[in-house]
Amino acid sequence: MSTESMIQDVELAEEALPRKTAGPQGSRRCWFLSLFSFLLVAGAATLFCLLHFGVIGPQREEFPKDPSLISPLAQAVRSSSRTPSDKPVAHVVANPQAEGQLQWLNRRANALVANGVELTDNQLVVPSEGLYLIYSQVLFKGQGCPSNHVLLTHTISRIAVSYQTKVNLLSAIKSPCQRETPEGAEAKPWYEPIYLGGVFQLEKGDRLSAEINLPDYLDFAESGQVYFGIIAL
């Protein structure tokens, strides 16, 4: 049997089928299409309502209710955002022009001394009694490791009005070199940041200083790497 004769037989068989069966099949197909369209529209409307009323979607960041679980810096940010900006605050930066010393500047675009705080003799003078967040960061940079052990220190000190003695509030020591660079080997660069921060009860007239032991290793390549500041809570 040829292919053409098989096709003709199939066409004749289709013509021989009762024409009345086409009616119920068409009605059933229309019913299914209507049901599918209804479910699609209902699902889209439900999803829109859930998104609109916040039942689903990105979760909001929540702060813990226990204040002890919040870092001092986070508490300072929350406190300052809810109160008028009349609290003492200072953020000073290092002078990249001062060779061999760490000198703080307040007359820069990214520096601030306000609401009674003063920068005197490279120290921040506290204008009123209260809790303060004190912070500072330095960045050291070097090339290779010498034979003598390199110890980098960063310290925040306080000279209180009640007793004229310098007392360390925060201090850290780091060593960037574990071993001496072998003779003839490539001297690779190293970087060592030190950050200090904490909350302290201060008195009016207290003086605060942030100091290091090896200023020749300070990195001033980018602004905002070496700074010192206080925020009244």
Swiss-Prot record:
Entry's transmembrane regions = 36-56
Q: Which residues lie on this side of the membrane: Cytoplasmic?
A: 1-35
Where is it chiefly localized? membrane
Q: Which domain of life is it from?
A: Eukaryota
Q: Glycosylated where?
A: 80
Q: Where is the lipid attached (N6-myristoyl lysine)?
A: 20
Record domain THD: where: 88-233
- Return the InterPro entries for the record: TNF (IPR006053), TNF_alpha (IPR002959), TNF_CS (IPR021184), TNF_dom (IPR006052), Tumour_necrosis_fac-like_dom (IPR008983)
What positions are modified (Phosphoserine)? 2
Q: Which residues lie on this side of the membrane: Extracellular?
A: 57-233
Which chain positions carry the site (Cleavage)? Answer: 34-35, 39-40, 49-52, 76-77
Topology of this chain in the membrane: Single-pass type II membrane protein
- What GO biological process, any one, is recorded here? positive regulation of NF-kappaB transcription factor activity
Which GO terms of the molecular function aspect are on file? cytokine activity; tumor necrosis factor receptor binding
Binding partners and assembly: Homotrimer. Interacts with SPPL2B.
- Which PANTHER family does this chain map to? TUMOR NECROSIS FACTOR, TUMOR NECROSIS FACTOR FAMILY MEMBER
Q: Which family does it belong to?
A: Belongs to the tumor necrosis factor family.
From the Swiss-Prot or TrEMBL record, give the protein name: Tumor necrosis factor
